[in-house]
Amino acid sequence: FTPAREGVPEKVCKQLITDITKEYRAIKAPVVPFIKATQDRVTLEIQRGCIRGCRFCQAGMIYRPTRERDVETLKASAREMLQNTGHEEISLSSLSSSDYSELKELVNFLIEEFHGNAVNISLPSLRIDAFALDVMSKVQDVKKSSLTFAPEAGSQRLRNVINKGLTEEDI
């Protein structure tokens, strides 16, 4: 490797933001298109990284360690982003949404705060072994909110090989 410019180090080191709440710069007033888009929603990153160690997941390894955003910061960002965009859906995004420690509080806030607007809550990347039925039933009560569960393997042997940590009974 020969750098194209002087002053560029030969070895590039990974940079890591340890406090993702302090360094949070959400796009609070994004450009909203005039047409209906498929992903017509606000996306709120609730945490970065993953506590799981699934052997197939590159993102789980790259974004380590797991870092959660402060729930109060997320509440303020959600309020501002939904008001600024007029979207009727918010996606709580992370590699494993159900592992966020303040998920119940955040979902309850969103339901209470935007009850009159019937804002949908989308929870992608849920783990079968980590979701709470009470939270999920509240999400489903609002409107057409969506839940996306992470795929599991077809056999116990394969689940063991890829380090899913689930049994047939769990599923």
Residue positions per predicted region:
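N-terminal pre-triad scaffold of radical SAM enzymes
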Residues: 31-55, 82, 145
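Conserved SAM/AdoMet-binding glycine-rich loop
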Residues: 79-171
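Iron-sulfur (Fe-S) cluster-binding segments and ferredoxin-like electron-carrier domains
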Residues: 57-73
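Short helix/loop capping segments that flank catalytic or ligand/cofactor-binding pockets
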Residues: 2-3, 9-13, 53-56, 101, ...
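Gly-rich Lys/Arg/Thr-decorated short loops/hinges at beta-loop-alpha junctions or inter-strand turns
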Residues: 33, 56-62, 153-159
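N-terminal [4Fe-4S]-dependent radical SAM core
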Residues: 1-43
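Conserved, mostly hydrophobic/aromatic
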Residues: 50, 54, 74, 123, ...
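Terminal amphipathic helices with adjacent charged low-complexity linkers/tails
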Residues: 1-17, 66, 70, 87, ...
